[in-house]
Amino acid sequence: MCSTPGGKWHIVSGRTQEHVAPYMAVGLSTVVHGIGSRQDIERNLRIVEDGIHAAVSIIGINMPVRLIALAEGALTGFTDEIFDIPHVTAARDLFIDIPGPETDRLAALARQYDTYIVAQCKARWPEVIDKRFFNTLFVISRQGEIVHKAAKNHLWCRERSCVPHDVYDRWVELFGDGIDAFYPVLRTDDIGNIGTICCSDGEYPEAVRALAFNGAEVVYRPSEAVPMTQMGMEPGGTWLLQNRAHAHFNNVYMVCPNVGPVYVHPRMEHPYDIAGGNSHIVDYQGNVLGHTASGANTFVAGIIDIEALRQFRTMNLNSNWMKDLRTEIFRRMYSEPVHPKNLWLNADPLQHADVDEIYRENIGRLVARGSFTPPAQAFPGARYIAPSESPEDADWAQVRALWPEPAEE
């Protein structure tokens, strides 16, 4: 089956499920080179290809590899976020279409190794809205077909991707307003039901719960800047803590590859490890199956047993928590908005400093409602500090000069 936002699933009562054989899932952590044009993605693709060849050769001797997961940024990096490039400019000059030549390369690998590939990439979605890009999650089948496509729904404060909520009315017009419109799940007969979120999405318990309600059994959550979100003494910091909790509360597997060190631009002598490694795979009870401390061109692997998960969910009278939910008592909790919708439906997305003010207004709403209690004394809060040569739209050429001129096509 193919899943896209708003896709409907038809369940046949009493149907006997086919047995899903255990399989190996692999998460890649690859070194990333920032891109100055779409052509620069080629370099990252070569690194990903080498990583897939190596990982399958090494881990495939244990059990068939049926799911390979790439980290966030593995293809397109983070140029737009780091340099605060205007959204429309980044959509035009940097990002891809799905399907396209880049996904065709991954499709060839999926066919070669008889595996699904799940990945993230910033991509245009013109059938939704023009001159925008979305942080997009997609799955390629063993036959090399794109069978799932979803958008990231929550951003950290320095990401300027468009999300469905930013163009809410248009999104609902196309896909409806059900859970499946925002958290579609890919249902397969050979690797289980796959849900996808990305990085900041996982800071909200509702995201994985929505996928679980929609049938997800394996959830892909790539990348987190672990040092930024509190590392602490435990490997993986709060990122691993969150993913173990997601797995435990929802009885899902979590497949979580972290991005490797990043060369922001070609003139950097050394890459910067912005994410801190600690890729992991967690089982449906919250146990860590695989953990890799390093993030520098390596991988994490773990065995996924869908049949065991299904038995656990349906035989259990205790720790399959979703069965106990009293949904009516939570219904009004979200009746009042926090973040405004449709911000970029009729206006171009703003840059970092201006968006900071939107977040401050959100904080103000929570204070006004009594959700947040203000401190006794107010101090200046976090703010955007521009680099010495902050690029406005007219200065994109100056930033672009950090990269060699792309070859003529």
Feature map (PLM): residue ranges:
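C-terminal beta-strand edge segments of enzyme domains
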Residues: 2-11, 253, 258-409
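Beta-strand-turn-beta hairpins that frame and shape the catalytic cleft
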Residues: 14-27, 184-195
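A short, N-terminal amphipathic alpha-helix
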Residues: 48-62, 106
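Metal-dependent catalytic neighborhoods of phosphoester/phosphodiester hydrolases
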Residues: 74-92, 128-133
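A short acidic, glycine-rich active-site loop
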Residues: 89-104, 169-175, 240
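CN hydrolase (nitrilase-like) catalytic-core segments centered on the catalytic cysteine
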Residues: 98-118, 193, 199-300, 402-408
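Active-site catalytic loop in hydrolytic enzyme cores
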Residues: 108, 125-245
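Short beta-strand scaffold segments in enzyme catalytic cores
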Residues: 119-121, 135-139, 184-186, 279-281, ...
